[in-house]
Amino acid sequence: MAHKKAGGSSKNGRDSNAQRRGVKRFGGQSVLAGNILVRQLGTKVHPGNNVGLGKDYTLFAKCDGVVTYEKFTRKRRVLTRVHVLPAEQ
């Protein structure tokens, strides 16, 4: 004989881990080659000088330097581009 009533079953109770997207290095910050600048879905921020684009749209520094962001217009849309200004040797 059962001593407990049957517990209900639920199809909820799961959650995925956060993706941790966003800007990792802001304008004016110093970076080393290979540092991640922005993690994003699609190109919210476009790569500029000395910035590479990974297969998951991650932007990374190609050389040591200082990060700068700029707004620019393309086909009547205002877009953001990130550059790395090389450090003076």
From Swiss-Prot:
Signal peptide: none
Organism from which the protein derives: Oleidesulfovibrio alaskensis (strain ATCC BAA-1058 / DSM 17464 / G20) (Desulfovibrio alaskensis)
Name assigned to this protein: Large ribosomal subunit protein bL27
Keyword Ribonucleoprotein: yes
Region (Disordered): 1-26
Record family assignment: Belongs to the bacterial ribosomal protein bL27 family.
Cross-referenced Pfam families: Ribosomal_L27
Gene3D superfamilies: 2.40.50.100
Superkingdom of this protein's organism: Bacteria
One GO term (biological process): translation
NCBIfam families per the UniProt record, alphabetical: L27 (TIGR00062)
CC per GO annotation: cytosolic large ribosomal subunit
Keyword set, alphabetical order: Ribonucleoprotein, Ribosomal protein
Name of the coding gene: rpmA
GO function term, MF aspect, one: structural constituent of ribosome
